[in-house]
Amino acid sequence: MQVSVRDNNVDQALRALKKKLQREGVFREMKLKQHFEKPSEKKAREKAEAIRRARKLARKKAQREGML
């Protein structure tokens, strides 16, 4: 991954790098890989995440329809 430093502004380049890494999910993956996760725990976590995403999507859809 590359980030260009313009006008010797390292702070801005670091912010851009952090944003790219966050978008790619690198920090989340590092956190998950710190400890071994049993397959059953992984399955339960992924199921909970899917439920959370579905609820969020339904909430956004309801809000959008209510606004129109």
UniProtKB/Swiss-Prot annotation:
PROSITE patterns: RIBOSOMAL_S21. One of its GO terms (molecular function) is structural constituent of ribosome. One of its GO terms (biological process) is translation. The keyword Metal-binding does not apply. It holds the Pfam family Ribosomal_S21. GO terms for cellular component: ribonucleoprotein complex; ribosome. InterPro entries: Ribosomal_bS21, Ribosomal_bS21_CS, Ribosomal_bS21_sf. Keywords: Ribonucleoprotein, Ribosomal protein. It comes from the Bacteria. Belongs to the bacterial ribosomal protein bS21 family. This is Small ribosomal subunit protein bS21. It comes from Ruegeria pomeroyi (strain ATCC 700808 / DSM 15171 / DSS-3) (Silicibacter pomeroyi).
